[in-house]
Amino acid sequence: MAKQTPLYDEHVACGARMVDFHGWMMPLHYGSQIDEHHNVRQDAGMFDVSHMTIVDLHGPQVKDFLRYLLANDVAKLTEKGKALYTGMLNASGGVIDDLIVYYFDETFYRLVVNSATREKDLAWITEHAKDYVVDIQVRDDLALIAVQGPHAQEKVQRLLSESHRQIVAAMKPFYGVQLDDLFVATTGYTGEAGYEIAMPKEQAVDYWKKLLAVGVKPAGLGARDTLRLEAGMDLYGQEMDETINPLEANMGWTIAWLPEDRQFIGREALEKLRATGTDKLVGLVMREKGVLRAGSAVHFTDDLGELREGVITSGTFSPTLGFSIALARVPAGIKDSAIVLLRNREIPVEVVKPGFVRSGKALV
């Protein structure tokens, strides 16, 4: 039976259509996915992301452990609360999960991992922690709400005390801070400003209602997906998985190659892949009518006149732009145009860098 977050009854009360999402009953939408999408781009929306897993790691060797476990290097994190995005890889360089890690001090870090990969993530972390003095604490006592949009920060700050408001208002992107019972982070998955806020489960309903009272509207999984795709952000299981390495998923920037003597899981395989070359992830824009969908073939001719083929990993109609966009994995050598096979028709598409909308503004 699918699990419920502490906010399940609130979703139902708001008229949500509930669906099973990787073993969790979650809101797909509250009546109109497109309205929810526009509300996040233009005002402020909130998502229940309590199905995600927060893992706190404590101990004298936790920094060394994470420098081995993750492709990005936590040694970069020297300011309290600073976060980074990284892949957690297998020995062949495939992505076990993508996650965010927060630094509190040399003996305390926090990971936020995906719900779909929870069990394998925890098993992987536990297995590799055996050689280190590390205490693993899964924070199932916490709920998590993401508040996103151009007015999200102002509306959240209305709910804070004056002293906390000053702290939060001064935060840069990709930081987290503990404010009594609330953990407030300047992170998100929409391409908009906002916060991801963790709190004790028993406080989630009250906080949700307070957000509603200051004009933050709920948004479901449907809008979350179109927003992240407009922002050019990867989704685990679509853009990457255990058979896909970061270089093929537009995650090359999350690999810390330096210092050269840092050994992390998957490094040897990645160095070979970097030397031989890999496919790459690109953005596609289709201004004709129709919708680009995952699984569709992408064709182009390379400099040698050879016909090459890739595949769409995620595609949708963009509510902000008014036409279809997609992410696609293709062989290197693609230029600024390609052909997509759509219902037995060859449709021309533009090839762009991943990322179509940021902070409400079109990038294409």
UniProtKB/Swiss-Prot annotation:
The keyword Transferase applies. Pfam families: GCV_T, GCV_T_C. One of its GO terms (cellular component) is glycine cleavage complex. Gene3D superfamilies: Aminomethyltransferase beta-barrel domains (3.30.70.1400), Aminomethyltransferase fragment (4.10.1250.10), Probable tRNA modification gtpase trme, domain 1 (3.30.1360.120). GO terms for molecular function: aminomethyltransferase activity; transaminase activity. It is an enzyme of class 2 (transferase). InterPro entries: GCS_T, GCS_T_bac, GCST_C, GCV_T_N, GcvT/YgfZ/DmdA, GcvT/YgfZ_C, TrmE/GcvT_dom1. Keywords: Aminotransferase, Transferase. It catalyses: N(6)-[(R)-S(8)-aminomethyldihydrolipoyl]-L-lysyl-[protein] + (6S)-5,6,7,8-tetrahydrofolate = N(6)-[(R)-dihydrolipoyl]-L-lysyl-[protein] + (6R)-5,10-methylene-5,6,7,8-tetrahydrofolate + NH4(+). GO terms for biological process: glycine decarboxylation via glycine cleavage system. Its EC number is 2.1.2.10. The keyword Ribosomal protein does not apply. Belongs to the GcvT family. The glycine cleavage system is composed of four proteins: P, T, L and H. NCBIfam families: gcvT, PRK00389.1. The glycine cleavage system catalyzes the degradation of glycine. This is Aminomethyltransferase.
